[in-house]
A protein has these predicted regions:
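Rossmann-fold NAD(P) dinucleotide-binding segment
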Residues: 46, 50-101
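NAD(P)+-binding Rossmann beta1-loop-alpha1 motif at the extreme N-terminus of oxidoreductases
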Residues: 1-56, 173-177
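Short, positively charged
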Residues: 19, 77, 113
């Protein structure tokens, strides 16, 4: 396919890295020049151009601008009715983006994560998932959502990633101070968390780790008594309320 990217930020760059080896002709905008140059250096089928040339050379266009910049930038561009647009933006609805890219339709809003560069990542999709599935589904899991309300809820819940990473980093620091190989200690914890959650539903995993008096049960009960669950739900509610 002929793919174009308007706004070559971190997530859009990761997405293109994940599929650049599949034979697509990819044209990316000069925005975030370091990311664009890295793609062209690593993949001979990726080129850099100004925004309008990106459109002229593309049949599928990924729009990955900051929501506040999108109206100003997109209004200056001429889209074609035969193009398909995938928005990677939050803070601006697919309908609002479609008004800016007309006559090209927005077929989906897609929210990947940095791991999409290597595969094995979740990708949230609102709209028609077929095109996203065709491009990314071989290496990643596509989660198709019903409507904008579901997208908003998923956006809030995915913020769990940062606190979980913080907890793993803190535990790795604690462990690393007590063993000879601190990098190995962190690698162990990351592998432990990732593999355990990948292989079992979370509630089932909690029960499997609920041996009376065991290390896992004792630490979980300590964390729960400290208000971990209430703090998490309060934080999610605050995100949902726009805080």
């Amino acid at each position: 396919m002929r793919l174009g990217v308007i706004g070559t930020g971190t997530i859009a760059t990761a997405a293109m890295r994940g599929i650049a080896g599949d034979g697509h002709q990819i044209t990316v905008s000069r925005r975030s020049a370091a990311n664009a140059e890295g793609l062209t250096r690593d993949f001979p089928n990726v080129s850099v151009a100004d925004n309008q040339t990106v459109l002229d050379q593309s049949d599928v266009v990924f729009v990955a601008l900051l929501a506040g910049d999108a109206p100003r930038i997109l209004r200056e561009l001429a889209f074609r009715p035969d193009q398909q647009v995938i928005t990677l933006m939050t803070g601006i609805s697919p309908d609002e983006v479609a008004a800016l890219t007309a006559p090209a339709p927005v077929v989906a809003q897609m929210l990947p994560f940095p791991a999409v560069a290597n595969g094995g990542s979740p990708i949230i999709v609102l709209g028609a998932p077929d095109l996203v599935q065709a491009l990314f589904g071989a290496r990643n899991r596509i989660f198709a959502l019903r409507d904008a309300a579901e997208m908003d809820a998923y956006l809030c819940a995915q913020a769990l990633l940062s606190p979980v990473a913080r907890m793993v980093a803190d535990a790795a620091g604690w462990l690393g101070a007590r063993v000879d190989d601190a990098p190995q200690a962190e690698a162990f914890l990351r592998t432990l968390i990732a593999s355990s959650l990948a292989d079992m539903e979370s509630n089932a995993l909690v029960q499997a780790l609920n041996t009376p008096g065991g290390y896992n049960q004792r630490l979980r009960l300590h964390m729960e008594a400290s208000g971990m669950g209430q703090a998490l739900v309060a934080g999610l509610d605050a995100l949902e309320g726009g805080a």
